[in-house]
């Protein structure tokens, strides 16, 4: 099956979050299953064509009469980079700079989507599925129906629109409609109007043939007023077309048996290397090397979506136990100072590294005994799956993908982690204390570790589910 996959970021070339991970991995997994997949994304200013190994593409591609240059990264699922010096090439941030969105994001991503829809005709492709991701590509289904209705390259093509995070909706003043080349008739409540603004996210939800999001539980949550970000009524109307498909993880980049970031390697059958990773982590972050003390890890944005307010509130009571805490992250300056101060006040119990370090993120996953993810909401989440693969027991709030990937320990021989439901510091503390109590039972803890490491969270599993959905749309 021919598939055109469109995303505003594609790892490793451009990435601000989970979308970049998905766009970098899912098309490759689909290609490995025998599908013909092409990916379309902007050539952001941070991408050096020469350093990235991109090749120029000779094409007659145009968007609204304007010639468009194109680059390609060859591979099983070739990635086409759309060039536009003003809209993409001269920007530092993908979506904004200095904490503010770029003022022309509507024009930027309308241009990307139009370029993606014009690309099959220019390159001789005949995709049966257009897989469009997040608000940046939300105009795609409408544009396919109204600007490409007679395009032979897209004849019979069906659209899949994936919600990676419903909280980001692509909202713009209605006055941008003429600049986008959209008729005023789309500015209706049953189309793209959203509280007197233009919503790219709503456009995708209203007009795509199928909707997906990144976990089954998140798919249910966004049907409710509490989780639907004011789009729940539309989503309930489209509930039959909404599918929750879990993201996967890159099991090659995240493999404790081969990870180049680790000082020692290990498997479920031989955990000696994990003990060595724990000691090395304690040394690296300046904590006493004490193998008998449980280490709780966090790799996170310091933002309330991630439940960091719960961690901050629960930390004093947690430190009443004999435990060490290692945190890596950045975000809200107030929380940065909270954890930096905790590290200063408890230098033998707390280590806080403000910023991001890919290698240290891997070493925390490998060296910690448990991993805290008390998110307020979490469409999918990746770190809990990394933790399972690295034998690090997750303590999670049972929302979104966390609920779908972590089974609560039953006290005997089932479960892969510890879950809680209420969004309170006490609920987090109770779940963490459960984990610390079980940590002292080496046999029960070993069972938790081994069951977690046996979980299949590969992209192969996710790709099979997407492929099954595609075939219901384009048999």
From Swiss-Prot:
Catalyzed chemical reaction(s): [(1->4)-alpha-D-glucosyl](n) + ADP-alpha-D-glucose = [(1->4)-alpha-D-glucosyl](n+1) + ADP + H(+)
Binding site for ADP-alpha-D-glucose: 15
Pathway: Glycan biosynthesis; glycogen biosynthesis
EC numbers, comma separated: 2.4.1.21
Family: Belongs to the glycosyltransferase 1 family. Bacterial/plant glycogen synthase subfamily.
Function field: Synthesizes alpha-1,4-glucan chains using ADP-glucose.
Identification of the protein by name: Glycogen synthase
Organism listed in the record: Anaeromyxobacter sp. (strain K)
Upper lineage: Bacteria, Pseudomonadati, Myxococcota, Myxococcia, Myxococcales
